[in-house]
Every structure is written in C-alpha cells, then in structure tokens.
Curated annotation (Swiss-Prot):
<feature type="modified residue" description="Phosphoserine">
    <location>
        <position position="276"/>
    </location>
</feature>
<feature type="modified residue" description="Phosphoserine">
    <location>
        <position position="67"/>
    </location>
</feature>
<feature type="modified residue" description="Phosphoserine">
    <location>
        <position position="206"/>
    </location>
</feature>
<feature type="compositionally biased region" description="Acidic residues">
    <location>
        <begin position="35"/>
        <end position="44"/>
    </location>
</feature>
<dbReference type="GO" id="GO:0000470">
    <property type="term" value="P:maturation of LSU-rRNA"/>
</dbReference>
<dbReference type="GO" id="GO:0000460">
    <property type="term" value="P:maturation of 5.8S rRNA"/>
</dbReference>
<feature type="region of interest" description="Disordered">
    <location>
        <begin position="1"/>
        <end position="125"/>
    </location>
</feature>
<comment type="similarity">
    <text>Belongs to the RRP15 family.</text>
</comment>
<feature type="coiled-coil region">
    <location>
        <begin position="108"/>
        <end position="144"/>
    </location>
</feature>
<feature type="cross-link" description="Glycyl lysine isopeptide (Lys-Gly) (interchain with G-Cter in SUMO2)">
    <location>
        <position position="108"/>
    </location>
</feature>
<feature type="modified residue" description="Phosphothreonine">
    <location>
        <position position="19"/>
    </location>
</feature>
<feature type="modified residue" description="Phosphoserine">
    <location>
        <position position="280"/>
    </location>
</feature>
<feature type="cross-link" description="Glycyl lysine isopeptide (Lys-Gly) (interchain with G-Cter in SUMO2)">
    <location>
        <position position="208"/>
    </location>
</feature>
<feature type="cross-link" description="Glycyl lysine isopeptide (Lys-Gly) (interchain with G-Cter in SUMO2); alternate">
    <location>
        <position position="239"/>
    </location>
</feature>
<protein>
    <recommendedName>
        <fullName>RRP15-like protein</fullName>
    </recommendedName>
</protein>
<feature type="modified residue" description="Phosphoserine">
    <location>
        <position position="58"/>
    </location>
</feature>
<keyword id="KW-1017">Isopeptide bond</keyword>
C-alpha cells in the first residue's frame, strides 16, 4: 500500500502536467475574478491571493502547485503597479525638467518666468522711480538751503521793528492811493461836463503820477531833508550869480558878444589907459 500511494501521486502529477492549457486558463480566470472582488488595495490583493492559495491547498495537492504558480503572478502584478507609479513620477519630473531647462528666445514670451523682457521693464521702472526721488530730494534741499527757523526769544526786537516798518509801509501806500484818487477827481471836476476833456485828462494820468505821490508821502523826514537842501542850493546860486570880479573868469565870457562889436571892446581898455596916466600926472 505504501508503494502504491507514491505511485498514485506521481500519476496524478503527470496527469496534471498533461492537462490542457484551457483548464489552466479557467482556473486562473476564476482566481483573478475572486481577487478583483475582494481586493481594494494592493495589501488586500495580497491577502486575497493568500486566501485563495489556502483554498486550493485544501482541495487537492495538485491544485496547490497551480495556486503557487498563480500567487507568483499576483506578486508580480503588485510589483509592476509600484514600478509603473514610480515610472510615471519619474516621467513627470523629466518632462518638467526639460520644460524648465529649455532655452527660449527673448522675442517669444512662451514662459513668463524665463522671459527677461519683463525683468528689464521692472528694472527700468525701478530706476525711473529712484531718479524721481533723487530729483525731489534735490529740489527740497535747494528750497530749504537758506531757510532758518526764527527764534522768538532772541529775535523779538527785530520782529517788532519789522512789524512797525510793515505797518508804516501799508499805511503810506493806502494814503498815497487815496490822495491820488482825490487829485484825479479834482481834475475831472475842473474839466467840467465835456467828455472830450475828461478823456484827455484821464489819458494823461499815468503810473509816474502815482509813484510821485507815493514818494511824496514819505513824511516829515523827507520834508525836513528837502528844507535843509534848499538853503544850500540858494547859497550856491547866489555865489554863482555874483561870480568873480574879472569877466574873463566867468563861464559866460564872450558868449553874448557879436562880431560887429569886436573893436569896441578892444578900444575900451586903450582909452582908459591914457586917462589913468593923465590923472597920475596931475
């Protein structure tokens, strides 16, 4: 019996090896359908392959060999799935690297990050802003060059003097305007109702008249100064009128003489000389 059992096993193995390929395909198809229904992940698929392998072990020893042959393709499929996912990631990385490392011409803005035209424009705008800021700083520095904040405590007296001068100038200006208006009104009244005379009078009024009035409103100081100058001018005029005793030293010597009187003036001194000599003899 012991010898018969090994012989039967060998015969069964030979029969299984001689079975047609159709039966093997049917078995593998059934295993694949069971695996697809039960497996949700790669780990579940491995568990399902193990369960099917146990099932076939319990049925027969011959099917054990077939299940082992089927389990190996399951492991290979999982490995292939992992390799395919890694391969797709590597392909994506290679494609992105090619795109990023690709040298594009500057005239064609295909990739905005690699386009240097925009960078040049940004740098140009930045330089223009910096130049504007520098120009503004220079202008402010020029305007604030000689400006000094006044000190209220130290410059108190000078500020008072300046205020007095300003008030005097304003008062003098308004007084001059009022006086000039009065003068013009008086002249218009003197002209009467004739429009021609009024137009002629208004045309004669000019800026110089107002400036002369404004200069005449300097106050008592100008009047006293003018009164002091007048006597000096009179004294000089009197001295010039008296002049030197000898007529030759005068400035107007021979200015009013005519050609017909040339002999008379020359005879005068000659006639006087003998008279003086006769007087001396007597």
């Amino acid at each position: 019996m012991a010898a018969a059992a090994p012989d039967s096993r060998v015969s069964e193995e030979e029969n299984l090896k001689k079975t047609p390929k159709k039966k093997m395909k049917m078995v593998t198809g059934a295993v694949a359908s069971v695996l697809e229904d039960e497996a949700t992940d790669t780990s579940d698929s491995e568990g399902s392959c193990g369960s099917e392998k146990d099932h076939f072990y319990s049925d027969d020893d011959a099917i054990e060999a077939d299940s082992e042959g089927d389990a190996e393709p399951c492991d290979k499929e999982n490995e292939n799935d992992g390799e395919s996912s890694v391969g797709t990631n590597m392909g994506w990385a290679d494609a992105m690297a090619k795109v990023l490392n690709k040298k594009t011409p500057e005239s064609k803005p295909t990739i905005l990050v690699k386009n240097k035209k925009l960078e040049k424009e940004k740098e140009k705008l930045k330089q223009e802003r910096l130049e504007k800021i520098k120009q503004r700083d220079k202008r402010l520095e020029w305007e604030m060059m000689c400006r000094v904040k006044p000190d209220v405590v130290q410059d108190k007296e000078t500020e008072r003097n300046l205020q007095r001068i300003a008030t005097r100038g304003v008062v003098q200006l308004f007084n001059a305007v009022q006086k000039h208006q009065k003068n013009v009104d008086e002249k218009v009244k003197e002209a009467g109702s004739s429009m021609r005379k009024r137009a002629k009078l208004i045309s004669t009024v000019s800026k110089k008249d107002f400036i002369s009035v404004l200069r005449g409103m300097d106050g008592s100081t100008n009047e006293t100064a003018s009164s002091r100058k007048k006597p000096k001018a009179k004294q000089t005029e009197v001295k010039s009128e008296e002049g030197p005793g000898w007529t030759i030293l005068r400035d107007d010597f021979m200015m009013g003489a005519s050609m017909k009187d040339w002999d008379k003036e020359s005879d005068g001194p000659d006639d006087s000389r003998p008279e003086s000599a006769s007087d001396s003899d007597t």
